[in-house]
Swiss-Prot record:
Belongs to the bacterial ribosomal protein bS20 family. Residues 1-12 have a biased composition (Basic residues). This is Small ribosomal subunit protein bS20. SUPFAM superfamilies: Ribosomal protein S20. It comes from Desulfatibacillum aliphaticivorans.
Length: 88
């Protein structure tokens, strides 16, 4: 356990940020799953609309420091590639 006042504050901040990051990551994973399910179901329109929402969430996670910006770019690129392959 932290002994200094500043260490106590940092420990409290870390738990708050950990919960926030966990919710962002959960939301991100769920949206990626939705895109993949739409691609597997061969529904082009649904996949495209979900992809736009997912890109927004991925960019927000990257800007807030939840995931690295290169990771965000890679995820967006791979998802877009899947959807475009489906669209033909």
């Amino acid at each position: 356990m932290a002994n200094h006042k500043s260490a106590l504050k940092r420990a409290k901040q870390n738990t708050i940020k950990q919960m926030r990051n966990r919710s962002y990551k959960t939301r991100l994973r769920n949206m990626v799953k939705k895109v993949n399910q739409a691609v597997e179901a061969q529904s082009v329109d649904e996949a495209k609309t979900i992809l736009v929402e997912t890109q927004s969430i991925i960019d927000k996670c990257a800007s807030k420091g939840v995931i690295h910006k290169n990771t965000a770019s890679r995820k967006i690129s791979r998802l877009a590639k899947k959807v475009e392959a489906l669209a033909g």
